[in-house]
Amino acid sequence: MSEPELQLVARRIRSFPDFPIPGVLFRDISPLLKDPDSFRASIRLLASHLKSLHGGKIDYIAGLDSRGFLFGPSLAQELGVGCVLIRKRGKLPGPTLSASYALEYGKAELEIQKDALEPGQRVVIVDDLLATGGTMCAACELLNQLRAEVVECVSLVELTSLKGRERLGPIPFFSLLQYD
């Protein structure tokens, strides 16, 4: 991994204390998205990691609603593969499958179109940030329902103190930046 590129990415993540509620330190990726060099570096770094581990053995990138959509298509293009969308409930037309995940107060659902993938296709799930792992686990469940193979989950940022990586069990996980 290129240290100068990683530093370019890291410098574009800013922190907002007590947002959206007191006690939360919000990691904002907006400056990264505004800077084409930093954004390109983030895509190159994620793609380089995936190429080194999986070579040409990835069929699709699955982007998670909503900020995973910012990285999914660009990462897919860099790897020369397609991108599928995993959306919040009620946002996809046609027949869908759904999986629930817990929120701090209640639950939410993700959906994928039933014909998004074929059994056995190898998929990498991407999101901007991994916190508790609830969303990523629900996405893995959806892909398992389609009998696709989740080869890895990746994110730009990981909040290590929330232990989301542990919830993924045996599924490999990679993040460019880690914060407590």
From Swiss-Prot:
It comes from the Eukaryota. This is Adenine phosphoribosyltransferase. Homodimer. One of its GO terms (molecular function) is adenine phosphoribosyltransferase activity. It is found in: Cytoplasm. The modification Phosphothreonine is found at residue 135. GO terms for biological process: adenine salvage; AMP salvage; purine ribonucleoside salvage. It comes from Mastomys natalensis (African soft-furred rat). The modification N6-acetyllysine is found at residue 114. Pathway: Purine metabolism; AMP biosynthesis via salvage pathway; AMP from adenine: step 1/1. The modification Phosphotyrosine is found at residue 60.
